[in-house]
């Protein structure tokens, strides 16, 4: 079940591969995510010292968050993957034009997981072409519905 999706990612990037990663969270963050107070819109993933980190994601603390914990909504969060997957991703990201971006936050067996994508940036003309293709698919479906209802 999806909690948060990064719809902008599919508009701005070609997604080549998808991976599922665990994410290191504190208790107040888990509660806030369960309440639907998370955003991935401006988030991206950096590689530091052979580890992956989620940067720029926003998790708004609940009003009932503990007073002895100082919540930071945009802190850097570590991602958990197998070492072989991390090495593979590092090798692919070092190629020109590739980056890692968060696509989706979801539950799996009671845990919160992050789906990340190996992505290549779209140029402006690619974005326009994708938009035209989507628009044509919508028009085609609309025409088929009209045709079926008139029969």
From Swiss-Prot:
Matching Pfam families: SmpB
Subcellular location field: Cytoplasm
UniProt GO molecular function: RNA binding
Keyword annotations of the record: Cytoplasm, RNA-binding
Any one of the GO CC terms: cytosol
A Gene Ontology biological process term: trans-translation
Family: Belongs to the SmpB family.
Function, in words: Required for rescue of stalled ribosomes mediated by trans-translation. Binds to transfer-messenger RNA (tmRNA), required for stable association of tmRNA with ribosomes. tmRNA and SmpB together mimic tRNA shape, replacing the anticodon stem-loop with SmpB. tmRNA is encoded by the ssrA gene; the 2 termini fold to resemble tRNA(Ala) and it encodes a 'tag peptide', a short internal open reading frame. During trans-translation Ala-aminoacylated tmRNA acts like a tRNA, entering the A-site of stalled ribosomes, displacing the stalled mRNA.
HAMAP family reported in the protein's UniProt record: SmpB
Protein name, UniProt field: SsrA-binding protein
